[in-house]
């Protein structure tokens, strides 16, 4: 079965609010085997909503509406659908009583327009609104399923979980959808695709969907099966094939992120970290401290933006700054080693480079050096050649720091 989500509300078209309902519903529907092929947004206009209904009926088995169930004149979803289906609107007694009780409790007048919220399509299954007034409803007619839900996410989401999903399962084959996200760093989307292109071209079940985002690449593997164990086997087989080719760039699954993975390894190995940041200006340290309980492994950092701080606090030799420059392999090495010693940590990591938009020390924007000093091991400096805006270069530099830290920790 395939569905179309139709969000109703002029405020969505004006960009005043984001359509988070569609994202939530798409994910939930996919998990029970209902394919969402279209998202539509239409304003509070009867004629245009009717046109959207007619288009959706021509290409979807299920039409899911969010918004337009309120008490005002521009809340016209129910009325338009009732007219389209030649159905009457009738009062749902439970909803009417619930709304009436609310107004009594709050000492407000229960006006006629508020009674409108208790109107439902005749013959529809009614979904109680435990967090608001207007109920939702579901109607199966003319070979189509119509679902009407309130617009506010705080009302729609719990209604979906408690009442709508159990109702929708009556229309599914029992075949569920299971997904796993593989996360990669240090390889571009096009490079990764080339290495697994034959797997993408031959995909059936599971499917493979690549996505690039802020210097990372993810592959979403999605399998359909009635049995979760069989779906896991399908996904695992394809994952194994992928990691045989690009496993060196793989670092985690689903909602795992680089900084969390690196800190997890620091805790596991009982090592402490310090950082010296020039071009990143504290971005790396900020991300470290986003993780709970990080005080056990993070000693602190030095923002050494000016050369005076590099020289007098972190003891980068004046000769290095004069000859090689602040943006250099040698400077990154001294920063990493000396911040480690200064803060008495097991590991020192450093960032120096040109964020742009202008060149510096005759070096182009995106020229970056990340230094990594771990205990008594030889210090390693990773040269980077990044592209993007000033902010993107800074953020990607910090990510590369976490990536190289994570990979190095895996080795020791």
Curated annotation (Swiss-Prot):
<dbReference type="InterPro" id="IPR001453">
    <property type="entry name" value="MoaB/Mog_dom"/>
</dbReference>
<dbReference type="Pfam" id="PF00994">
    <property type="entry name" value="MoCF_biosynth"/>
</dbReference>
<dbReference type="Pfam" id="PF02464">
    <property type="entry name" value="CinA"/>
</dbReference>
<dbReference type="Pfam" id="PF18146">
    <property type="entry name" value="CinA_KH"/>
</dbReference>
<dbReference type="InterPro" id="IPR036425">
    <property type="entry name" value="MoaB/Mog-like_dom_sf"/>
</dbReference>
<dbReference type="InterPro" id="IPR041424">
    <property type="entry name" value="CinA_KH"/>
</dbReference>
<protein>
    <recommendedName>
        <fullName>Putative competence-damage inducible protein</fullName>
    </recommendedName>
</protein>
<dbReference type="InterPro" id="IPR008136">
    <property type="entry name" value="CinA_C"/>
</dbReference>
<dbReference type="InterPro" id="IPR036653">
    <property type="entry name" value="CinA-like_C"/>
</dbReference>
<comment type="similarity">
    <text>Belongs to the CinA family.</text>
</comment>
<dbReference type="InterPro" id="IPR008135">
    <property type="entry name" value="Competence-induced_CinA"/>
</dbReference>
<dbReference type="InterPro" id="IPR050101">
    <property type="entry name" value="CinA"/>
</dbReference>
């Amino acid at each position: 079965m395939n569905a179309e989500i139709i969000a109703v509300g002029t405020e969505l078209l004006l960009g005043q609010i984001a359509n988070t309902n569609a994202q939530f519903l798409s994910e939930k529907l996919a998990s029970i085997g209902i394919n969402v092929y279209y998202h539509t947004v239409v304003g509070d206009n009867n004629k245009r909503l009717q046109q959207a209904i007619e288009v959706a009926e021509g290409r979807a088995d299920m039409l899911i509406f969010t918004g337009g169930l309120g008490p005002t004149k521009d809340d016209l979803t129910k009325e338009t659908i009732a007219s389209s289906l030649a159905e009457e609107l009738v009062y749902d007694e439970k909803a009417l009583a619930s709304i009436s009780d609310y107004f009594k409790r709050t000492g407000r007048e229960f006006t006629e327009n508020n009674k409108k919220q208790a109107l439902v399509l005749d013959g529809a299954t009614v979904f109680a609104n435990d967090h608001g007034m207007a109920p939702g409803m579901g109607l199966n007619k003319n070979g189509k399923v119509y679902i009407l839900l309130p617009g506010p996410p705080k009302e729609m989401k719990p209604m979906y979980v408690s009442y709508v999903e159990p109702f929708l399962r009556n229309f599914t084959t029992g075949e569920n959808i299971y997904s796993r996200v593989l996360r990669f760093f240090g390889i571009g989307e096009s490079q990764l695709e080339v290495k697994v292109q034959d797997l993408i071209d031959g995909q059936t079940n599971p499917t493979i969907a690549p996505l690039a985002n802020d210097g990372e690449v993810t592959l979403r593997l999605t399998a359909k099966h009635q049995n979760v164990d069989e779906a896991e086997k399908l996904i695992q087989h394809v994952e194994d094939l992928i990691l045989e080719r690009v496993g060196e760039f793989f670092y985690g699954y689903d909602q795992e992120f680089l900084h969390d993975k690196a800190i997890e390894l620091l805790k596991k190995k009982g090592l402490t970290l310090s950082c010296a940041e020039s071009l990143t200006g504290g971005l790396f340290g900020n991300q470290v401290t986003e993780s709970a309980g990080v005080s056990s492994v993070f000693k602190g950092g030095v923002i050494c933006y000016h050369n005076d701080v590099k020289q007098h606090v972190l003891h980068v030799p004046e000769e290095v700054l004069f000859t090689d420059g602040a943006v250099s392999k040698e400077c990154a090495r001294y920063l990493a080693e000396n911040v480690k010693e200064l803060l008495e940590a097991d590991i020192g990591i450093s960032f120096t480079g040109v964020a742009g938009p202008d060149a510096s020390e005759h070096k182009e924007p995106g020229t970056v050096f990340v230094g990594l000093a771990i205990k008594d091991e030889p210090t390693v400096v990773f040269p980077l050649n990044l592209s993007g805006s000033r902010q993107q270069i800074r953020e990607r530099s910090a990510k590369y720091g976490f990536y190289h830290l994570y990979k190095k920790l895996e080795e020791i």
